[in-house]
Amino acid sequence: MQIHPLITDSATLAALCSRLSRADFIAIDTEFIRENSYWPELCLIQIADDKEAAAIDPLAPGLDMTPLTDLLVNNEDILKVFHAGGQDLEIILHHTGKMPFPLFDTQIAAMALGVGEQVGYSNLVERYLSIKLDKGARFTDWSHRPLDRRQLDYAIADVTHLATLFPMLLKELRDKGRGAWLDQEMERLADPSQYINDPEKSWLRIRMPNRKADILGRLKALAAWREIEAQNRNIPRGRIAKDETLADLAIHPPRRQSDLVKVRGLSGSWGSNDIGQRLMEAIENAEALRPEEIPQRNDRKLCIGKDGAMIADLLKLLLKMRARDAEVAARLIAKSDDIEGIIAGERENNPVLTGWRYDIFGKEAIALIEGKMAFSVQKGKIAMTLIEKE
């Protein structure tokens, strides 16, 4: 595979993208930093097909990224391959306003092949290619220039090996008849709503034991205010105000802006500046939530009770058995919420009860719940047996 020098000029990038536009697939990775910002700062993009690979410097002065943007988000004839691509996709969506499509994620593929629950890239490379990757540049400040040879070698290895891994994983999936298993997971991965932080929904991430409509209304307004401030100023939301501070303000709202100086966790200057004024406006304009807007407590665990918790343990044992038999990661078949939903009788839209998941696990899970199957020990091994009707 040809490895190009770091691309910093528009003509070289355009020529590369023109060649890659004829590929069946491209492997993609990004390097970024986000410790001190709300939005991740894109510092490097690595890209490869089965013939060539390059790292692209998005921080290079005057670099026209249009050809790369077109390749990533406007060309749907090329499959885009990532490993654990959630953060890469978030960055691409933020910078281009669109999602790459179609997608393939090698971490999810590895789960479907029973390699591991969330296998890391280096472990996957070592398993399939017998190559041990150098991890020395993992904690690089990718925004610092110039990047040295070791940093660039580390970065480019993220796509050169990925381009080799992808055909191997795809063939194994097809040989095992699992090519379609990933469709639902890839659709979820490509859903832009997975990566967009809606200020109006940000309050739902904050733990709040109080269920009063007026308090929750203030919390919603405060969380939206914080999210917008963080986005506009491009700083982490926690540096605006901690969750606990917002919860306290929602329960004990200050009467005047000058009272903000007494609130622990807020800057004293907010008692008289524009930020404090916007915070007070959020509190004053907050509306109590309507009954239907108040999230229901997670009563599922209470609903299923202690026996339900033990039934969940039995279902998890069954899941572990069937995942082992099928050589697929249990987490890809069913999550705890899916299992609790089965026990609580919530069977509509449960992914476990459709398609291949139903065949591997869901069918027997329902039979176990309905008393039609039971665990038994046969020749020292746990097995499932049908219960014959009297």
UniProtKB/Swiss-Prot annotation:
It catalyses: Exonucleolytic cleavage that removes extra residues from the 3'-terminus of tRNA to produce 5'-mononucleotides. Its EC number is 3.1.13.5. It is an enzyme of class 3 (hydrolase). It is found in: Cytoplasm. InterPro entries: 3'-5'_exonuclease_dom, HRDC-like_sf, HRDC_dom, HRDC_dom_sf, RNase_D, RNase_D-like, RNaseH-like_sf, RNaseH_sf. Residues 212-293 form the HRDC domain. Keywords: Cytoplasm, Exonuclease, Hydrolase, Nuclease, tRNA processing. Its cofactor is a divalent metal cation. Exonuclease involved in the 3' processing of various precursor tRNAs. Initiates hydrolysis at the 3'-terminus of an RNA molecule and releases 5'-mononucleotides. This is Ribonuclease D. It comes from Zymomonas mobilis subsp. mobilis (strain ATCC 31821 / ZM4 / CP4). The gene is rnd.
